[in-house]
Amino acid sequence: AAQMQLEVLKSQIDPHFMFNNFSILSELIVEDTALAEKFLDNLSKVYRYVIQNLKRDTVSIEEEIAFLHSYIYLIKMRYEDAVCINIDETLKQIDGQIPPVCLQLLVENAIKHNRASARHPLSIRVFREENDIVVENDLRPIASDFESTGIGNKNIVGRYLLLCKKKPFIEQRENTYIVKLPIINNT
């Protein structure tokens, strides 16, 4: 039963990721076809990673960071200087695991739910703190009529509880949103 729950939680990522990126691609096709072609090439690389890892419960932190860099390329193509993402490169040296696509989902949610402009860029930081990988972003919520369903965070928490019985730490401060993902030790 736990394996079935894990598969359902992992499958929630696929449509969420796909439709958000196709929406970006659609806008780029109208704006600049050469840029759209380059974006599509990188989207293919990113999507290949997602497909290749759907059946895996965890990936190395090094693999996940490499994937996140590819994803950030797509983000920079779309948002340019409106989003500033800083990844501590020493994360690649950690001998541990993480559920696939968790970091990307947190970065995507930060961008989706916060105001960002070239004048006031949204800052997102990814770094290590003790036995956690931390994704921290400025908190500047977009004023809108829609209420977040929290599916992304619920998905991540659910995956962690099923995999290692550890729960990610999620905190909203006055100006900062923080998620701490436990590093899963290699066994």
Predicted regions and their residues:
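C-terminal end segment of the histidine kinase catalytic
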Residues: N186-T187
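Two-component histidine phosphotransfer core
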Residues: A1-P182
